[in-house]
Amino acid sequence: VKHVRLIRHGESAANAGEASLDHASIPLTPKGIEQARLVVSSFTQAPDLIVASPFSRAQATAMAVVAAFSYVPFETWPIHEFTYLEPARCANTTVAQRRVWVETYWAKSDPGFRDGAGAESFLDFVTRAQSFLHGLAEHPAENIVAFSHGQFINAVAWLIERKPHQIDSRAMADWRDYEITNHVPNCRGYMLTLHPGDSDWKWSAAES
């Protein structure tokens, strides 16, 4: 049986209400660093593989586990957060300052829409989540831990639970409701399982 522990990064500066230069370089707060340390103590055995998003806050969270299990392979996969607003427009803004832009984006409910240079569409985002599940299924490691982000984690869970037939406006609205309802706290996440010969992943809430 393949087990994948999917964990959101520790508290970041943006989570704490601070302005951020860009989506990729947001650092952890001291609280986030401590949360990452606590994740290590929750492991009862070493994983076969440690994976992290390329974004700084996920890499920093993963480093505590990498340090504890230095002999375990560590890889960076494209499981970064959904960047749906143009990064240049968001430079040096806070979550509160971006709220109107966020609401406008979701009200449009257009899966193929890209906000600008460096932004991805909802369809791009879901395709990444689908590729992640495929990559996990194909990987020889049986016990994997992956450090990612709240929206990406919920895209994975939504795909497993809802099994959408097509990514249209209705599916996009459904995912947005799902994400708001199932907020993933820092350093928490889901446990994914895949049984031999089965093509359907299962998921459950995982304590971190």
Predicted regions and their residues:
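Short beta-strand scaffold positions
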Residues: 52-53, 127, 147-148
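Glycine-rich phosphate-binding loop signature in dinucleotide/nucleotide-binding domains
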Residues: 43-46, 136-142
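Phosphate-handling substructures
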Residues: 27, 66-130
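Conserved histidine-centered catalytic loops in small-molecule metabolism enzymes
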Residues: 44-78, 100-108, 184-208
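Active-site-proximal alpha-helix that buttresses catalytic centers in soluble enzyme cores
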Residues: 2-75
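Acidic, low-complexity terminal tails and accessory targeting/binding regions
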Residues: 2, 71, 82-96, 158-208
